[in-house]
Amino acid sequence: MINLGKTSPLMKIVNNAFIDLPAPSNISSWWNFGSLLGVCLILQILTGLFLAMHYTSDTMTAFSSVTHICRDVNYGWIIRYMHANGASMFFICLFLHVGRGLYYGSYTFLETWNIGVILLFTVMATAFVGYVLPWGQMSFWGATVITNLLSAIPYIGTNLVEWIWGGFSVDKATLTRFFAFHFILPFIIAALAMVHLLFLHETGSNNPTGIPSDADKIPFHPYYTIKDTLGIILLIMFLMLLVLFAPDMLGDPDNYTPANPLNTPPHIKPEWYFLFAYAILRSIPNKLGGVLALASSILILILMPLLHTSKQRSMMFRPFSQCLFWILVADLLTLTWIGGQPVEYPFVVIGQLASILYFLIILILMPIISSIENNLLKW
């Protein structure tokens, strides 16, 4: 019997990536989120493909085509809600995956980490253009407000915005191109994910201790295939719970009103997974300053390897850094809450303080605390 996994050029790649891959014996459930993100991506591409078969990217018919999908297409409602809530699951897994990387020092794999940050940006861009497609009130005004931010770029800003819009306002041309972007970007994400994996398999996985695990490796299959399968079952259970019992819980009621350029909603806000960045944007009164802070809030992740001053890779044995990490998590949850609140006292002040704390922890406190821990180890 010929072992195809060892002889076929194609199966050899699959074998080396998912079957005979040497993996650390002590990686915890925090390492499950990579495979869960892969499942989310496949799920989003499949549900999105079926939605695209019935969706029309025209300002006159977009809203009614989504209604038609929910009412008239066989199981259209479940496909639509799996796609909408699948995006939320995608971002939950994404944030936990990035959080795991920060906590256990996985950012020292430079290529893997930088591709990951690019992936994060691409997924955020995909989610943004996708939110515009149902052409509800929040879709239209969200697109108007966020694309308008580019006008803060000196000299070329206004031209850039009009170029993205395809006119002098968000209209038919904008919706058509956003649909095109939303269709192509997931395939770019899939390609980037493969590059992400390629670089990861060059070094091998990190583990909770941050210590090299070459001395104790186990094959990926069956140990981690079983472990990942459990994670996938739980993910799908949680997603279906959301889809079947509370499909609109994470959405905005304003998006059930067709887009109207003459009527601005009282509170324009993005989906929940962008609220932390939106709160940082709003906390700065200056337009350009806000845009820079918004970009910096994600781009700051690229600096993580440079800001690592500890002699230990992981936070597992660094209690002070752990405290700071969980303060950062609490701060991000506070920013998420603030992003959904109206622009008035006391929310503005809380948002400004939380934004300052976010940058303060990452840029200043983390490196200082790490250095203090290094000195304490000398005792």
UniProtKB/Swiss-Prot annotation:
Keyword Iron: yes
GO terms of molecular function: metal ion binding; ubiquinol-cytochrome-c reductase activity
Positions with a binding annotation for heme b b566: H97, H196
Superkingdom as given in the UniProt entry: Eukaryota
Cofactor: record remark: Binds 2 heme b groups non-covalently.
Entry's Gene Ontology cellular component terms: mitochondrial inner membrane; respiratory chain complex III
Cofactor requirements of the protein: heme b
Localization per Swiss-Prot or TrEMBL: Mitochondrion inner membrane
Regions that span the bilayer: 33-53, 77-98, 113-133, 178-198, 226-246, 288-308, 320-340, 347-367
Keywords: Electron transport, Heme, Iron, Membrane, Metal-binding, Mitochondrion, Mitochondrion inner membrane, Respiratory chain, Transmembrane, Transmembrane helix, Transport, Ubiquinone
Sites where the protein binds heme b b562: H83, H182
Note: Heme 1 (or BL or b562) is low-potential and absorbs at about 562 nm, and heme 2 (or BH or b566) is high-potential and absorbs at about 566 nm.
Entry similarity comment: Belongs to the cytochrome b family.
Name of this chain's protein: Cytochrome b
Native source species: Axis axis (Axis deer)
Gene coding for it: MT-CYB
